[in-house]
From Swiss-Prot:
The lineage of its organism: Bacteria, Pseudomonadati, Pseudomonadota, Gammaproteobacteria, Enterobacterales. GO terms for cellular component: cytoplasm. Homodimer. One of its GO terms (molecular function) is intramolecular oxidoreductase activity, interconverting keto- and enol-groups. Keywords: Cytoplasm, Isomerase. It is found in: Cytoplasm. InterPro entries: 4-OT-like_dom, Tautomerase/MIF_sf, Tautomerase_PptA. Its EC number is 5.3.2.-. It is an enzyme of class 5 (isomerase). This is Tautomerase PptA.
Length: 76
């Protein structure tokens, strides 16, 4: 039951663009984890730039920096 939680700066994506992103992310999971499409859930959340550090960096990125599969190319 893979769950993908994507946080990003506001991009003004239409509903169709958000759905396309979720669909493509789902296909990557299906391909690499051999999951069923119906087992994958995707959350897309826009985070304001001024809130990124407190909402994402401090709570999700920094605490697990050593175990991230891909580390960001920036520090805060």
């Amino acid at each position: 039951m893979p769950h993908i939680d994507v946080k990003f700066f506001p991009r003004d994506l239409s509903d169709a663009q958000q759905q396309a992103l979720a669909d493509e992310l789902t296909q990557v999971i299906v391909k690499h984890l051999q999951s069923k499409e119906s087992s994958v859930s995707v959350a897309l959340k826009e985070v304001q730039p001024e809130q990124w550090k407190s909402e994402v960096w401090d709570t999700e990125i920094a605490p697990q920096l050593d175990t991230l599969a891909r580390k960001p190319g920036y520090e805060m």
